[in-house]
């Protein structure tokens, strides 16, 4: 029996589209300062799965704003630089590993796209995006 140590996860920033205008489509890519970022630490070289629970809409009051995540809206790297990120589809479970030498670390990013209608009511729209990280056992 091999008992792995614990996984620690720290959300370093939220996905932020900034100010957007009506009648537009706005994308925040993984390598943008607006992308969400998590730092994960655990057993060096351990396999992990990344599972996102993503919203379909952002909301303020009863008003909604569509949000989507394409097949390159997720990114992960042993380095804390999205330029080196391996892109993945956050709509599917993603399997990877923590850095195999030194501290077992992984940085994860999330981008996304909002579609703003011509009649979109103003407001600060929000919704939770949840990341679950689990050891794979390998």
Task: Briefly describe each language-model feature range.
Residues 1-63, 97-138:
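N-terminal small/polar-rich segments of proteins
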